Amino acid sequence: MEATMLISSVKRVGKVDPRLYSSFIEHMGRAVYEGIYQPDHPSANKSGFRQDVIHLVKELNIPMIRYPGGNFVSGFRWEDSIGPIANRPRRLDLAWRTIETNEVGIHEFYNWCQHVGAEINMAVNLGTRGVDAARNLVEYCNFPKGTYWSDLRRSNGQESPFGIKTWCLGNEMDGPWQIGHKTAEEYGRLAEETAKAMKLVDDSIEVVLCGSSNRQMPTFGDWELTVLDQAYDQIDYLSLHQYYGNQKNDLSHYLARSLDMDRFISEVTAMCDTVKAKKHSKKQINLSFDEWNIWYHSAEQDEQAAPWQIAPPLLEDNYNFEDALLLGCLLITLLKHADRVKIACLAQLVNVIAPIRTETNGEAWRQTIYYPFMQAAVYGQGEVLSPQIRSANYATEDFEEVPYLESIAVINDKELVIFAVNRGEEEMNLTVHLSELSLEGVIDFSEMSGFDTKATNLPKSEQVKPSHSTNVKAEDGKINCLLKTLSWNVVRCRLSDEGGTKNER
């Protein structure tokens, strides 16, 4: 199979916001307890955090982590999670029908984020609470000193403010499963007033308005237009959530699901711009795709979980090779929309539908989806270029034209990086033509290929991972490479001529 790309340095989508590679940790299952925090584990530091997990998270180059939920946040009293640990109450978590000990709270999570080099994206409870609790939390976290809440933070051991800059106005408030579920009109008014109060405390923060819980919601579209119309002037981002699965065990159909994500992003972008035009506003609302991933493997086992346990295993999907391929396609799709998608959170980070898994009495390990995400987060920084791609297509029941080649290019001062997925069951000879670009040569060609599509990683057996390929050549303004059957590929090239752009006269 043959495919071509034309990459021009002047055809740019936009700059990659590093927060595109964010993630999410919820007080749910073993994400926190036995995930990031396990004081009796051999690798635990003096604060009780697993250093093997810290090491794997740092490898992912994650800039920001959404916290503490998720459905959990709609019943969360943030005051329960501060002060002496011994005095913190145990609470029923109605979202996941477990018991929350509050042993890890705001201070502990902030300290863990310092270890992994990430900021917090804090969600506030707009299910059972509202304006007052939210503005008090901003004061507690961000106000320097001299008030009740800021001085309480200082007395709890944090002299300087946490300085949290990104805040979510609740979680999935359109969902009937949500504690405190609201209509679009109810939520829009509450979100507007909550954002207003929060920004009166700290006018440097940015806030995310809840969009639909997924594209299949019966209120999708109407919800977005209603809440945006109400809260537009007070908010900065609109959220999107979507998970994908291969319940039909149809690989071709499954690998096309990224086209659904592409359509979803385009639709929500259009809604934001519709309300902007209606209001004659100069303000642009960008997108926060703050829950996305693959989620379907664990559905049946979770139905059998007994209620009211502390940190039971929940949503511990074992990801396989085909999941890694789709995740690569989803990452490429997010990059294609880097002009409007400024935040995206892989949900979640540890144990719960996560790239990292832990053994209670053993080690932490990388799932198959870890590798595409890590490579994109490390190498996909800079400006996204919009290539012209020619590739054969196939059809599914949902999409008439699915390209066998899914690809995008990112450029920075030193490198041109091409991310590519071959969806096909034939090898692909890819020829990349360069316009206004000059290369010194290829730095590396990494590929994930040749695995059984159902192959998974296990503790001490991370066999589904990238390897180095020599099937690449760059010369005469072209890059030629062989993309193996069903493969995730990363081609890194060194730029010349002061960033690689040829001087134009």
Language-model regions, residue ranges each:
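Non-catalytic accessory regions flanking glycosidase/transglycosidase catalytic cores in CAZymes
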Residues: 1-223, 228-237, 261-262, 266-303, ...
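Active-site His/acidic residue clusters
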Residues: 241-257
